[in-house]
Amino acid sequence: MPYQINIANIKINGVTQNGNIDVGPTVHNSHTANSKYFGANFSLGDLSPTSSLLNTGNIDSDVSDQDQIGNPSAPISNQI
């Protein structure tokens, strides 16, 4: 299966569910995240089998982490 995104040595087959791949300085505007998934998938070399670990058991009391309470058209993009 050919890789759809290939940047230097980073190879990505796909991104779903409001996922982001950031290379360099990036500003995101008006994104919402209502679910969290933690996981990793490792492959050493192009032809090696992969192994993955996924944990979805978490407690998050604030439901929405990146909601649109403020003005979504005016992101804060300056560095602190």
Swiss-Prot record:
One Pfam family, short name: gerPA
Database matches in InterPro entries: Spore_germination_GerPA
Region (Disordered): 57-80
Entry protein name: Uncharacterized protein YdgA
